[in-house]
Amino acid sequence: MLTLNTRINSADKVSAQLVLPYESRENSRLRTALSSGEEVAIFIPRGTVLRHNDLLMGDDGRVVQIVAARESTYRITCANPHDLLRCAFHLGNRHTQTQVGEGFLRIARDNVLKEMLEGLGATVIEEDAQFEPEAGAYGSGGHHHHGESSQGHAHGPLAPIPVHQKIHRPSDIPSR
C-alpha cells in the first residue's frame, strides 16, 4: 500500500490522481484507493484540509495529485450583494461549510437550508460541482462544536480568546 505523508508545492511528474469528496479531504488519516485500484493511506498533520490540485508525495517518492470530486451542492445567488451577504451571514450563523465564489455561495445540499435561503430571497440551484468551502476564521479547516475546548490544536492568524480570559460586557458590571 502506498503511504502519502508529505504535501509538496510542485513536482516534475505526477504519478496518479486521487479523487476525493470534501468530507474525505478533511481527514488527516484516510485509507482509500486510486482510480487504478491501488490502495493508498494518507497520513498528514491533523487539521490539514486537502484542496483541489494539492500534491502529496508517497513514501516511495511517487506524487499523487488531489482532485476535488463533483458533489451534490446548491449554488446560491441573489439579486444584489446585500442579499447575498445576508445569506452568507445566516449560513455562517449555522456553522454551515460554505464556498464563497464571485457572486455566489455554494453549500452541500440540505433542504432545510434551501428553504431558509429561498425565504431570504435567494435563488438556489442544484448543481453537481467541486466543493471547496472556506477554511474558516482560524484557517485550520477543522472545526469544533460548542462546549468543546479549542485548546490542543493550532489556529491561524486570528487567535482564540484564552479560556481563562474573561470578556467584559456592560451587563457584567454590577450597577451602582
Swiss-Prot record:
Location, primary (coarse class): cytoplasm
Family matches, as CDD domains: UreE
Cellular compartments annotated: Cytoplasm
Xref: InterPro entries: UreE, UreE_C_dom, UreE_N, UreE_N_sf
Molecular-function annotations in GO: nickel cation binding; unfolded protein binding
Pfam families (alphabetical): UreE_C, UreE_N
GO CC aspect terms: cytoplasm
Positions of the UniProt region annotated as Disordered: 134-176
GO BP, sorted A to Z: protein folding; protein-containing complex assembly; urea metabolic process
Keywords associated with the record: Chaperone, Cytoplasm, Nickel, Nickel insertion
HAMAP family noted in UniProt: UreE
Function, as annotated: Involved in urease metallocenter assembly. Binds nickel. Probably functions as a nickel donor during metallocenter assembly.
Similarity-based family: Belongs to the UreE family.
Protein name from the UniProt record: Urease accessory protein UreE
The organism of origin for this protein: Nitrosospira multiformis (strain ATCC 25196 / NCIMB 11849 / C 71)
Gene: ureE
